[in-house]
């Protein structure tokens, strides 16, 4: 009888401890949620500034926010019409969340989904760096599947909307030392100065297998492939062609060049 009571008491104590612990864990998760959201926003702002060539490494959160607010303008783009839109608030709108909502996105036919993202949001957010009303840099969000993961990043274009000012990813799960070399500063530096379009205005940017021949007429559009990471390289090439194509920013860039965005 005594053993039975002891066992019951032990089980009750264990149950109470579990319940109390679960309450604390749930409470901590709720309490930390705003902080986690702020940190994600800060990381995103830091990435945008870096791609645009603004700021210095090691800036504090306050410095990042101040520089972002003073130099970067966020605007929402209607990808269907290729024009700026007031349909969404650029500060509160989340394109990635919208891409999962059938009411705010469209399913992509397999033949057109070269970036393997399945759905594309109808509105997205772009970022502009301007001086005295003149566009210096345009930052476009891009994403697509590599070998093991979806890569999320930004492509920065100079004011001519043809020359690459910066390119990089802020989130992915590619293999370190192979596909993970998309984070290598040397590889990212290869993109700066490359041009997206040829003399006829056709999209010509390309990641090639091996190294670019500097004497080639196509060298200005080409970037070295990642050694030992053919599928990641192909994935990056595909995602760029998707987002610069008709289902991405093609119409928007055309309108912006004409001053009609």
From Swiss-Prot:
SMART domains: FMN_bind (SM00900). InterPro entries: FMN-bd, NqrC. The modification FMN phosphoryl threonine is found at residue 230. It holds the Pfam family FMN_bind. It is found in: Cell inner membrane. Its cofactor is FMN. Its EC number is 7.2.1.1. This is Na(+)-translocating NADH-quinone reductase subunit C. It comes from Pseudomonas aeruginosa (strain ATCC 15692 / DSM 22644 / CIP 104116 / JCM 14847 / LMG 12228 / 1C / PRS 101 / PAO1). The lineage of its organism: Bacteria, Pseudomonadati, Pseudomonadota, Gammaproteobacteria, Pseudomonadales.
């Amino acid at each position: 009888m005594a053993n039975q009571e002891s066992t019951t008491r032990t089980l009750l104590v264990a149950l109470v401890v579990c319940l109390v612990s679960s309450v604390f864990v749930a409470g901590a998760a709720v309490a930390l949620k705003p902080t986690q959201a702020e940190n994600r926003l800060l990381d995103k702002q830091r990435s945008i500034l870096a791609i645009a060539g603004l700021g210095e490494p090691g800036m504090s959160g306050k410095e990042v926010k101040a520089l972002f607010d003073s130099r970067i303008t966020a605007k929402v783009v209607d990808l269907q019409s290729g024009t700026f839109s007031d349909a969404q608030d650029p500060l509160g709108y989340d394109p990635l969340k919208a891409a999962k909502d059938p009411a705010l996105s469209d399913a992509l036919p397999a033949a057109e989904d070269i970036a393997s993202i399945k759905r594309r949001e109808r509105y997205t957010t772009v970022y502009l760096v301007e001086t005295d009303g003149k566009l210096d840099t345009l930052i476009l969000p891009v994403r697509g599947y590599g070998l093991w993961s979806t890569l999320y990043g930004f492509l920065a274009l100079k004011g001519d909307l043809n020359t690459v000012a910066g390119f990089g990813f802020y989130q992915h799960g590619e293999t370190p030392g192979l596909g993970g070399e998309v984070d290598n500063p040397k590889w990212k530096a290869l993109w700066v100065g490359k041009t997206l379009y040829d003399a006829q205005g056709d999209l010509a940017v390309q990641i090639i297998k091996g190294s670019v021949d500097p004497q080639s007429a196509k060298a200005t559009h080409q970037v070295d492939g990642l050694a030992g990471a053919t599928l990641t390289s192909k994935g990056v090439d595909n995602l760029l062609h998707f987002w610069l194509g008709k289902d991405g920013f093609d119409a928007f860039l055309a309108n912006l060049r004409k001053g009609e965005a």
